[in-house]
């Protein structure tokens, strides 16, 4: 069953809020900006992670230095999963943040 528009927006909103909370609590020197449904995380190194919603496809998109990645929400697991590699958003973020900062953050709650 595909996500309804309302459910999709609720999921993206709660995911973005959880991400903000994780970064706020991390002690990392990051700037967070959430505007018009787009969350931008700017690291001290100049690297950025940009999270946006693609409503027609019901996907969460992540733009990073390595390129763009599209995530579908898997209702069974309750996780965002890459539509190409099937890597979980939580796993990809842990890897990218480690590459950018050397920090080991836990994104399992998303």
Curated annotation (Swiss-Prot):
GO biological process: iron-sulfur cluster assembly
GO molecular function: ferric iron binding; ferrous iron binding
Top-level taxonomic group: Bacteria
Disulfide bond annotation, renumbered to this chain: none
GO CC terms in record: cytosol
Classification via InterPro entries: CyaY (IPR047584), Frataxin/CyaY (IPR002908), Frataxin/CyaY_sf (IPR036524), Frataxin_CS (IPR020895)
Entries under SMART domains matching the protein: Frataxin_Cyay
Keyword set, alphabetical order: Iron, Metal-binding
Function: Involved in iron-sulfur (Fe-S) cluster assembly. May act as a regulator of Fe-S biogenesis.
Family per similarity comment: Belongs to the frataxin family.
Protein name: Iron-sulfur cluster assembly protein CyaY
Species of the source: Pseudomonas fluorescens (strain SBW25)
């Amino acid at each position: 069953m595909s996500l309804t528009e309302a459910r999709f927006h609720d999921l993206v909103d709660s995911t973005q809020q959880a991400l903000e909370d994780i970064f706020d609590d991390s002690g990392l020197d990051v700037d967070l900006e959430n505007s018009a449904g787009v969350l931008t995380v700017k690291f001290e190194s100049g690297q950025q992670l940009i999270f946006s919603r693609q409503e027609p496809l019901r996907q969460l998109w992540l733009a990073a230095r390595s390129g763009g990645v599209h995530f579908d929400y898997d209702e069974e697991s309750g996780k965002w999963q890459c539509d190409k590699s099937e890597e979980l958003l939580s796993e990809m973020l842990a890897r990218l943040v480690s590459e950018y900062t050397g920090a080991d953050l836990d994104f399992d709650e998303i």
